[in-house]
């Protein structure tokens, strides 16, 4: 069975309408339950997938805009914006760990997907060192997908060596069907970034912000040619470029509000009116592959 938990009951009820339809379509045998009660939700839970945005998207926009106003990076994972978001998130994340310790199965695992990943990971390690929690980010896998497109191969054919903390890591070796293709990839990325013809045709890279991100990888490789970077290094190593690129009147948070959030609200309205929706837009995308 799958439980959906949120502290915002109104939002929970609306989101659950979409989730019910997706579950019905993809896994009809799965029993879906909705709750805002901690004890009811977490009792005997085995796996807890956590993704919390403390303060909501409106606070994300504030983090971005206040930071940019002062010439700082406002991105949700790092810089001034990430630090502000992290300070809001650490407390609730520690509370979640304590709730799971109290109610969940003794062998529970929390798979934490909440940003800022590195800050939250360090905080949970420090404050709850024995917690059964895995702090993850899917960006390394997404970069691997770009590599596969560059090499014109399937992602499953790649084997990589990677080190670092969540978003901030480096690929030290990449093999394709057993062949070391690290230098080949370095040469491509140094000239084009993590962009290929296939990437331009990919829905993710049609987004100008993502195209800018993947293209920026070439600058990083030319600065540090030993390894292939996770794209999040741009926020540390290309800070001035990022601040200049970001639009204080059209931040990523605002784009999400006007994009995914708007689509979700429109879908909920249709479901409330008994209409059908295109469920494929709510299937797994770049996040959670």
Q: What residue ranges belong to the model's regions?
A:
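Short amphipathic alpha-helix adjacent to the substrate-entry channel of hydrolases
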Residues: 69-71
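Metallocofactor- and cofactor-centric catalytic cores in central/energy metabolism, strongly enriched
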Residues: 1-63, 74-78, 82-156, 166-171, ...
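Long, compositionally biased stretches enriched for glycine and/or charged residues
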Residues: 152-289
